Amino acid sequence: MRQIIAKRLVESKTTIPHYQVSMKFELDRLMALREQLNSELAGMGIKLSVNDFIVRGCALSMAKHPYVNASWAGEKILMHQQVNVGVAVALDEEKGGGLLVAVIRDVDRKSLRAISSETKALSEKARTRGLSMEEMSDSTFTVSNLGMFGVEHFTAIINPPNSAILACGAALKQPVVRDDQLTIGYEMTATLSLDHRVIDGAMAARWLNTLKGLLENPATLLV
């Protein structure tokens, strides 16, 4: 597996003109909504993660900005009709480590509950190396989240043939300024790595601003 990972990453870095754009997200409302929903859904065995909101937000952002949901195909840009988000899953170091990308299909048409359930099921299959080729194929965008490890900021290498990957840090509870007042709130830094053949800087900024609007007003993710 390590040889396959190495080959794909080297191919990505040497053939794709990478660049990165970062943005901070205020997650006070998202964390409060997540706590409320998890309290209401606890009896059903459902627990939404921050990443579930992020995946849903990414899908809705791509529906508005379809150029992020595209690939470079030789000499032209291929626009994808489906929004299939790959979720990077780290494998146990005790079992040799590695990384697999589990693919959630048609994410823009799925609820937070459905995304959460499917992500958990696919992640468990990934950790036991039980994913089928179909469950690892046809992603059009990838999310990599190291927030659960306390990482604040990082950049990720694009997962071909995708044109973008979002690297999410931790939602940190810290002193912040809200309405010109110093208070305690949640902030997350996310960095988007992009293929410059497909997505220009201003296009990336517009996509990130749409995502920011969704995550900072998380009720929009429930519609």
Which role does the model predict for each range below?
Residues 1-223:
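C-terminal catalytic/motor cores of large multi-domain enzyme assemblies
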